[in-house]
UniProtKB/Swiss-Prot annotation:
Binding residues for Zn(2+) 2: 154, 188, 225, 270
UniProt-annotated binding residues for Zn(2+) 1: 78, 118, 154
Protein name per Swiss-Prot or TrEMBL: Probable endonuclease 4
GO BP terms: base-excision repair
Reactions catalysed: Endonucleolytic cleavage to 5'-phosphooligonucleotide end-products
Gene expressing this chain: nfo
Species for this entry: Vibrio parahaemolyticus serotype O3:K6 (strain RIMD 2210633)
Residues annotated as binding Zn(2+) 3: 191, 238, 240
Required cofactor names: Zn(2+)
Transmembrane parts of this sequence: none
PANTHER family with a match to the protein in the record: APURINIC-APYRIMIDINIC ENDONUCLEASE, ENDONUCLEASE IV ENDODEOXYRIBONUCLEASE IV
Pfam families with a match to the protein in the record: AP_endonuc_2
Taxonomic path: Bacteria, Pseudomonadati, Pseudomonadota, Gammaproteobacteria, Vibrionales
GO MF term (any one): DNA-(apurinic or apyrimidinic site) endonuclease activity
EC identifiers of the protein: 3.1.21.2
Role noted for this protein: Endonuclease IV plays a role in DNA repair. It cleaves phosphodiester bonds at apurinic or apyrimidinic (AP) sites, generating a 3'-hydroxyl group and a 5'-terminal sugar phosphate.
Length: 295
């Protein structure tokens, strides 16, 4: 672990890698692109139910992580896209809660302590406040069922009826979660930008993260998704782009790489061209190491 830190500095930078062939393959794929962090799905993200993780797969995952120096703090599992923890219909809500608890249990089996998820949608059937309260209740139920795993709420772009695009939404959910030590936030730069929080310049970043700190609190930031945006500012549309090639530009990502407030948490690429992930990781790391050397 020490060697890894010396080589990579204090930034945990990686990408959302494939778990095809088994979750134990994900850490190997992360290392292939020079990552010291990674995200993965622990099951097929487009299915409600998956077969349980096999003991040999769990052992192989843990062994590969240990061999490559990945600790739980380096890894950000993502739940299924089907789950809506704020679903207004009882049947869909029950199904979503059961699936979310299963995702948490899988994380626990793998020795992982973070679970990243999209908060939920009101589908124009209940108020925003009711939906946010339902999301918080869903988190509380999962916490009571599964120990240790932190529920990491991802901010959204605000497409359709998705909640979580306003920092106030995140704060309102957290306020109603009983175990504050087991809830956090993952800020996606593309979602933040298209939701209406500017990130194009260093000054914009200062303002946006000051607002996040005031409304939610930087101490709740447990991970980030680093994505540029194909679509314009405040468009409420979620379309990722490669770093520096979209509407946000490199200044934002240089800012994050150089700012120590973003040290020690997974910084995960979900950019559109896996062929250049290694290049993107290297550029971010160069920014970070340059900042350290200039201290």
């Amino acid at each position: 672990m020490t060697n890894m830190k010396n080589k990579f500095g204090n930034k945990l930078i990686g990408a959302h890698v494939s778990a095809a062939g088994g979750v134990d393959q994900a850490p190997l794929r992360a290392r292939e692109i020079g990552a010291n962090a990674f995200a993965l799905f622990t099951k097929n993200q487009r299915q409600w139910v998956a077969k349980p993780l096999e003991a040999k797969t769990i052992s192989a995952f843990k062994a590969n992580c240990k061999m490559l120096g990945f600790g739980a703090e380096h890894i950000l599992p993502h739940d299924s896209y089907l789950i809506n923890l704020g679903a207004p219909e009882a049947e869909k809500l029950d199904k979503s809660r059961a699936a979310f608890i299963d995702e948490m249990e899988r994380c626990n089996q793998l020795g992982l302590t973070l679970l990243n998820f999209h908060p939920g949608s009101h589908l124009k059937k209940v108020s925003e406040q009711e939906c946010l309260a339902t999301i918080a209740e869903s988190i509380n139920l999962a916490h009571k069922t599964v120990p240790d795993v932190v529920a990491v709420i991802e901010n959204t772009a605000g497409q359709g009826t998705n909640l979580g695009w306003k920092f106030e939404h995140l704060a309102e959910i957290i306020e109603q979660v009983e175990d504050k030590d087991r809830v956090g936030v993952c800020i996606d730069t593309c979602h933040t930008f298209t939701a209406g929080y500017d990130l194009r310049t260093k000054e914009d970043c200062e303002r946006t993260f000051a607002e996040f700190d005031r409304i939610v609190g930087m101490h709740y930031l447990r991970a980030m998704h680093l994505n540029d945006s194909k679509v314009e500012f405040a468009s409420k549309v979620d379309r990722h782009h490669s770093l520096g090639k979209g509407e946000i530009g490199w200044d934002c990502f240089e800012y994050i790489a150089k700012d120590s407030r973003f040290d020690g948490i997974p910084l995960i690429l979900e950019t559109i061209d896996p062929d250049i992930w290694q290049q993107e990781i290297n550029t971010l790391r160069q920014f970070h190491l340059a900042a350290i050397n200039n201290q």
